[in-house]
Amino acid sequence: MDIIFEQALFPLFCFVLSFFIIFFTTTRPRSSRKVVPSPPGPPRLPIIGNIHLVGRNPHHSFADLSKTYGPIMSLKFGSLNTVVVTSPEAAREVLRTYDQILSSRTPTNSIRSINHDKVSVVWLPPSSSRWRLLRKLSATQLFSPQRIEATKTLRENKVKELVSFMSESSEREEAVDISRATFITALNIISNILFSVDLGNYDSNKSGVFQDTVIGVMEAVGNPDAANFFPFLGFLDLQGNRKTLKACSERLFKVFRGFIDAKLAEKSLRDTNSKDVRERDFVDVLLDLTEGDEAELNTNDIVHLLLDLFGAGTDTNSSTVEWAMAELLRNPETMVKAQAEIDCVIGQKGVVEESDISALPYLQAVVKETFRLHPAAPLLVPRKAESDVEVLGFMVPKDTQVFVNVWAIGRDPNVWENSSRFKPERFLGKDIDLRGRDYELTPFGAGRRICPGLPLAVKTVPLMLASLLYSFDWKLPNGVGSEDLDMDETFGLTLHKTNPLHAVPVKKRGRN
């Protein structure tokens, strides 16, 4: 009887148990948020995290790690969470899709040491009214299409001076430091736009000192620094970046303040009723904004803005021309093609003008190929997440530092055929430009943080390069063969050749 009773109750017990299981599993509250994983990354050591995995060229280290951990990976540098993206798709997410969330910066220890992060258009967050003012001034008074067109003759004249200097070196059969010569050209272009004066002189060592100072700024900002990962070490300045940046920036500030003081003195002496026939430059516009009870700027703001503009307008342009010349000397057949195109278009006119560049597609391809292999800022300027954000299915937490490794994207064999080869032909017939719309080639960044100096760079670099190729043939000094040309890099905010390129200009018959 008991057995029969148990047999009868057992199915009922199972039914009731099943009912409660189904009821509680289907009616209990569930989290509305899905669990989003962090990007994959290498194992971390206590305290230092992944610092030990980064060598003297972080863009190389990140590229190697991405082969194991994928196009979006997570790293830890001391106390600093870092995400590195290494594909066009991931770059689009960071630079465009989530541009607003990922548009702040994490100032470096050296930048904070001169309070540059509080006034700089590079380091201020876009939510800042000061950033919006400085960005607007740069866009409308410096780099607008109208201003770029208005300074065309200036750029052409400064490049003519470069060619003249090269001609003198050619007559003496002397090798030229390409980096230094093109830096002086870029320096005089930007200094005339800003101050209406030349700051560089091809026959003076002072120009070399100025270049070394600008490079010192870029390296002090871009070099690895223990205090960026462990803020409590900042006062020790273990790598010397704070000391270097303070010394270099103060030398530049002294130059800038000298021009500002001279302009203010000139302004005070000038009769307000007299007609000012001198063409106004950018600093004149800035000084107008320092006047009155509701002044929008002060002179300290101006010198810090000028520091940003000199870095963006000189070192990056000259280093790109140097890399282009180095690649052409390593690939003589490519140089011959570029020169043949230029000779065909320019003929015996004797000079390359900016209006000629649009008729030189192969030259433009050479410039793009140079930016692909040697982007001026290989990791761009790192961004910071203002809030948690999901990128390609992975969670990027608030305050994470985000790098876009444009150097690695430019050499990705999944994106580029024969990715390590210098081959300008890959761009012919393709609508790929440098203006932040094609994420396989974004050397200037994209979105609201795109480099404001891009319009000037895309005019200056091709003009300098075309003029050098039109007026001269080129050879390496001391019998060095093209296959022996050193292409080592030195990492900083700007990517330089470790050993500056020296080449001998050989004047073409009937030129200059």
Swiss-Prot record:
Cofactor(s) for this UniProt protein: heme
InterPro entries: Cyt_P450, Cyt_P450_CS, Cyt_P450_E_grp-I, Cyt_P450_sf
Keywords tagged on the record: Heme, Iron, Membrane, Metal-binding, Monooxygenase, Oxidoreductase, Transmembrane, Transmembrane helix
Database matches in SUPFAM superfamilies: Cytochrome P450
Any one cellular-component term (Gene Ontology): membrane
Ligand binding (heme): 451
Known EC number: 1.14.-.-
Primary location class: membrane
Similarity comment text for this entry: Belongs to the cytochrome P450 family.
Protein name: Cytochrome P450 76C2
Organism: Arabidopsis thaliana (Mouse-ear cress)
